[in-house]
Amino acid sequence: MDYILVLAKVYPKSGCKDTVIELSDDLIENTLCEEGNIDYQLLKSLNDNTLTFIEKWQSLDALKEHMASSHFQLFGSETEDFVEKMDIQVIGAEELNL
């Protein structure tokens, strides 16, 4: 199965990680209901102050629709004062059946 994999690493400002996590709840809940979404998780690093969204999408078009969604846009505006930066990787992937 081919899909789009997104690794979005979030660098919260000092003392803001819990706020970003709380603000992620609605984003995650709404995204999991989107057509074309396969998986959407938020992971907290054990080693540093980073958070990582791991996303799987059926297509690039589904990802683009997600990025245009109201809940994605709201998350961006709600968290902009709490985040230093984000690094986003978008990968076209094919599962290997080993």
Sequence positions of predicted segments:
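N-proximal accessory regions
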Residues: 2-4, 21, 59-64, 96
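Glycine-rich beta-strand-turn "strand-cap" elements at beta-sheet edges
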Residues: 2-4, 42-47, 77-98
